Amino acid sequence: MIWHVQNENFILDSTRIFMKAFHLLLFDGSLIVPECILIFGLILLLMIDSTSDQKDIPWLYFISSTSLVMSITALLFRWREEPVISFSGNFQTNNFNEIFQFLILLCSTLCIPLSVEYIECTEMAITEFLLFVLTATLGGMFLCGANDLITIFVAPECFSLCSYLLSGYTKKDVRSNEATMKYLLMGGASSSILVHGFSWLYGSSGGEIELQEIVNGLINTQMYNSPGISIALIFITVGIGFKLSPAPSHQWTPDVYEGSPTPVVAFLSVTSKVAASASATRIFDIPFYFSSNEWHLLLETLAILSMILGNLIAITQTSMKRMLAYSSIGQIGYVIIGIIVGDSNDGYASMITYMLFYISMNLGTFACIVLFGLRTGTDNIRDYAGLYTKDPFLALSLALCLLSLGGLPPLAGFFGKLYLFWCGWQAGLYFLVLIGLLTSVVSIYYYLKIIKLLMTGRTQEITPHVRNYRRSPFRSNNSIELSMIVCVIASTIPGISMNPIIAIAQDTLF
């Protein structure tokens, strides 16, 4: 009799849970249409892979790219709608979140054509690669819209697990295995630190998990200036720091960049920073509203360390990918300036604008590295000497992207840094802006050093890799070159469209 009653209660509870889930999906499902499109694309990929042969490989690329483009389209149709909190407070839909989701989708859309020839040449498993990329993109999108502590923890784990698998995709490469192990161990440690910080925030607010409710809970419990909040702030900053990879949380970055397949590095170098920046902005600005002085000081320290260490250590590197790893550490220091400035002086708008330009500059550089690596089999900076004499198109493209990363006018990087530093100066961050300007000059030095190698014509400096380099026509149907051309154009002629870009970014307010 007791068993019968318990069984009936279990059935009733299961029915209630199912009906609640169905109700949420029915009424709130329209708010996650872009994410649902990606999920549908993932299901299609699995179905085609399990029911077809190798001749249908082009369909896999087509479905992946189409699902990303359709997701971008759905996101744009939803633009400028009123902010909505859905799924019982798990997600928030607003312009700020959506523009970061757009940037993540843009990164993935550009990374897939960048990877096609590399995957074919290295004979990597195609379906799994595309599945991991789309799933990581999905995790990044959910992270941008996350509105409670549980979702903010689960969404980056979805992204991180796919990142670990992608970084170790070349299983026979010892460097890749070593990089993956470091990435996995440090990722697990950072996740533990992050969730420990969340537990302090949860307890101090009286058991609240939604970001805005945490603020209300801290006011009700009078704990907004307590030591527990300071402890939570430190742990959460360390946990998020792993995703952003500023100094001193950057130890995994150079090894993962050097050991992972180059298209994977290109994907991780932009998507992880975009998603983590969106999450960090919301976490610091909402739950830690009353501790703004403390987290400003923490982020200022991270920004200074990142800009100085990243750019100084990059000078000494001999590997192109390792140099870009340290360069990215310096770049995230510039982005942190926008987070610190906040909404009051267009800080978020400047951060978003710079992120958009950084995506094009960084992916353009990695597209050039992928092409050079496939044609020569080397990643050493010294082996780029004299590339202009063999492939002027590739050499000029790489030079333009590097100069844009350095911030030379009239390229995209210059306008992005100018807007970012100007907002920082208006907010009174004079020391940070001066450090940013000085380290930008340092970055220009090591970028120009590479460009000098590219343009050299002296025979004694040209290595056998370039001497035996296969010439490439100016016009090509190569998907990597097409992706590279798009990124190079976006990195070189932004001045014409700066005003509308800034205007759109300024609309992305809370």
Swiss-Prot record:
The gene is ndhB1. It catalyses: a plastoquinone + NADH + (n+1) H(+)(in) = a plastoquinol + NAD(+) + n H(+)(out); a plastoquinone + NADPH + (n+1) H(+)(in) = a plastoquinol + NADP(+) + n H(+)(out). InterPro entries: NADH-Q_OxRdtase_suN/2 (IPR010096), ND/Mrp_TM (IPR001750), Ndh2_N (IPR045693). It holds the Pfam family Proton_antipo_M. GO terms for biological process: ATP synthesis coupled electron transport; photosynthesis, light reaction. The chain crosses the membrane at residues 24-44, 57-77, 99-119, 124-144, 149-169, 183-203, 227-247, 295-315, 323-343, 354-374, 395-415, 418-438, 484-504. It is found in: Plastid, Chloroplast thylakoid membrane. One of its GO terms (molecular function) is NADH dehydrogenase (ubiquinone) activity. This is NAD(P)H-quinone oxidoreductase subunit 2 A, chloroplastic. GO terms for cellular component: chloroplast thylakoid membrane. Its main location: plastid.
